[in-house]
């Protein structure tokens, strides 16, 4: 498809629950797709099994498997600590849909912060979303475990298909786990 330069459609919008479901059912936009995670204008996403954390011994982030942690015995993100995390869900955005990650308000109110790199361009595919998380609390750890609701994705219908899709130009396609900077 090509973009019609100079043509403006008035139907640009955030997708509602039934539109998200239809896209996921038809195009595998989110895998796995659980309709129980639908909200009126977003889809909840879950924390995956891998983190990347800082080490005092190396400037590089170290990959950590947290699959054995549970709600009863969670991973502790200590005060001021930063980590990269991943979603359980794999995303396959068509060329006419973009999306944005937003931290669940309950997580934000507990002092967890997402550091604002949550935009996903049309055509981004075959990848789990990497999250940049920081514990903003001073005295208490944040408890993290696989499968917890961490945020929600808001999907945007594009006014037109872009001239260049992220499928052609993106660095972060086809990444099945948390990814550090590859630019």
Give the residues covered by each predicted segment.
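DUTPase catalytic domain/fold
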Residues: 1-183
């Amino acid at each position: 498809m090509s973009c019609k330069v100079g043509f403006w459609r008035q139907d640009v919008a955030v997708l509602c629950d039934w539109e998200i479901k239809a896209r996921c059912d038809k195009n595998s936009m989110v895998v796995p797709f659980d309709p129980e995670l639908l909200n009126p204008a977003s889809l909840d996403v879950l924390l995956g099994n891998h983190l990347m954390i800082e080490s005092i011994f190396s400037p590089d982030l170290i990959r950590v498997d947290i699959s054995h942690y549970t709600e009863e015995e969670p991973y502790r993100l200590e005060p001021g600590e930063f980590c990269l995390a991943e979603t359980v869900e794999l995303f396959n955005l068509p060329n006419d849909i973009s999306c944005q990650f937003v931290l669940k308000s309950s997580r934000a109110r507990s002092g967890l912060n997402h550091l604002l790199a949550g935009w996903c361009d049309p055509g981004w595919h075959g990848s789990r979303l990497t999250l940049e998380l920081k514990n903003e609390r001073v005295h208490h750890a944040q408890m993290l475990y696989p499968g917890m609701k961490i945020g929600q994705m808001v999907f945007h219908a594009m006014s037109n298909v872009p001239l260049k899709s992220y499928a052609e130009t993106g660095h972060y396609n086809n990444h099945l786990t948390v990814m550090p900077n590859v630019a």
